[in-house]
């Protein structure tokens, strides 16, 4: 059964490693050393719920609900544009230390709300967990399926905690004005690039829906 565990671990790692909204948010919280362990835990738990839903049959709801998929897609577009704008605004600030200090004033619940939006308003998360993992893990028997799911869940926990801890450890180097400008510019570009991709997918879905 360990072979199924390592298959899930490898596939989960391959899907989670690319820089996306979730990873960027966890990394930034780690650099700020602001609730970064809590955010890593909540991201991992969110992935656990999504992975279990995808592998154990919940994918049918999203795949059979084009209106729900469209709602998630366009909600993600709006959120990513807003999040990217905030990153660009911080990067272009004449006093980036002051701008970063303003961000640090955010309360715990606002940070949690942002994390939930980053995770649950990203349609790529549903495609990864429901379509990819659901199609592969859903074909397995009950016991192998559990080991496969455990492997993918392990990848999420290892990655998010590792990213948060590593970012916090490197914080003294990454919190310089130059590093913060570069990081925020990269994050802004990634967020807007993903938003444009989602908008393109959303237009295609709308055309198919009304054709």
UniProtKB/Swiss-Prot annotation:
General function of this protein: Involved in the export of arginine. Important to control the intracellular level of arginine and the correct balance between arginine and lysine.
Inducing stimuli: Transcriptionally regulated by ArgP. Lysine has a negative effect on the expression of argO.
Protein family membership: Belongs to the LysE/ArgO transporter (TC 2.A.75) family.
Keyword Transmembrane helix: yes
Protein localization: Cell inner membrane
Taxonomic lineage from the root: Bacteria, Pseudomonadati, Pseudomonadota, Gammaproteobacteria, Enterobacterales
GO MF, one example: L-arginine transmembrane transporter activity
Membrane topology note: Multi-pass membrane protein
Gene name tied to this protein: argO
Parts of the chain that traverse the membrane: 1-21, 37-57, 68-88, 111-131, 147-167, 182-202
InterPro entries linked to this entry: Arg_export_ArgO_enterobac, LeuE-type, Lys/arg_exporter
Pfam families: LysE
Keywords assigned by UniProt, alphabetized: Amino-acid transport, Cell inner membrane, Cell membrane, Membrane, Transmembrane, Transmembrane helix, Transport
Catalyzed reaction equations: L-arginine(in) = L-arginine(out)
Chief location of this protein within or outside the cell: membrane
Domain of life: Bacteria
GO CC, alphabetical: plasma membrane
Protein name: Arginine exporter protein ArgO
Native source organism of the sequence: Escherichia coli O157:H7
The keyword Transmembrane helix is assigned to this record: yes
């Amino acid at each position: 059964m360990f072979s199924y565990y390592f298959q899930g671990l490898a596939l989960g790692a391959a899907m989670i490693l690319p820089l996306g909204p979730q990873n960027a948010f966890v990394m930034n919280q780690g650099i700020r050393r602001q609730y970064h362990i809590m955010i890593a835990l909540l991201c991992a738990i969110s992935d656990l719920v999504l992975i279990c839903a995808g592998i154990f049959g919940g994918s049918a709801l999203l795949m059979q609900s084009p209106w729900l998929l469209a709602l998630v897609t366009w909600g993600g577009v709006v959120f990513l544009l807003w999040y990217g704008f905030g990153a660009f605004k911080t990067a272009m600030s004449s006093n980036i230390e002051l701008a970063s200090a303003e961000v640090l004033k955010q309360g715990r619940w606002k940070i949690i709300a942002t994390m939930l939006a980053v995770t649950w308003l990203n349609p790529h998360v549903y495609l990864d967990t429901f379509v990819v993992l659901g199609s592969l893990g859903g074909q397995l028997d009950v016991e192998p399926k559990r080991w496969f799911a455990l492997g993918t869940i392990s990848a999420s926990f290892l990655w998010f905690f590792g990213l948060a801890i590593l970012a916090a450890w490197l914080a003294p180097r990454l919190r310089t004005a130059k590093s913060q400008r570069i990081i925020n510019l990269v994050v802004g570009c990634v967020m807007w690039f993903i938003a444009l991709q989602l908008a393109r997918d959303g237009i295609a879905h709308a055309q198919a829906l009304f054709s």
